[in-house]
Amino acid sequence: MLYEVDGSGRRTDHKATGNGEFADFPMVLLANGFSASASEILAGALQDYDRAPVIGDTTFGKGSVNILRRLENGGGLYLTFAKWFTPEGRPIEGTGIDPDIEVVSRDSQKADIDQLNKANETLESIVAGKGALGSARP
């Protein structure tokens, strides 16, 4: 499903397991600048596998793997020791995931409504059989 690369360049693959119960379930994914970390990993994987179009705005760009080390003096040290990449090798850290269908507005409430409307329209198109799931990409 995705992989991480640590500071020494070692790659670790992470694959999804299960019986694929919802493998053919039509879906879209809403995202914006507040979508970060695990939600970006999911968005990137769904895009790379043409499983669901991402609708909205570019995500936050938090694709690092971090750990907090407690120090003897009571302080702490926050360390980044790896970075996440999508299945196709796209970095998430600092760039985020760009949507397949961009829907943005300066008014966040309007943007939410517009994104929901576009998601509904796109999902109806997928369900109606007007192309494969990934065909919702521009």
Where do the protein language model's features map onto the residues?
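Gly/Ser/Thr-rich loop/hinge elements
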Residues: 1-37, 64-69, 85
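C-terminal recognition in membrane/secretory proteostasis and scaffolding
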Residues: 4, 70, 103-138
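Extracytoplasmic/secreted envelope proteins and their assembly/folding machinery
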Residues: 24-27, 39-43, 47, 52, ...
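Flexible glycine-/small-residue-rich
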Residues: 31, 81-83, 96, 105
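Short, well-structured beta-strand/strand-turn elements
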Residues: 49-62
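C-terminal soluble interaction/assembly domains
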Residues: 66, 94-95, 99-105
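Short acidic, Pro/Gly- and aromatic-enriched capping/linker segments at domain boundaries
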Residues: 73-82
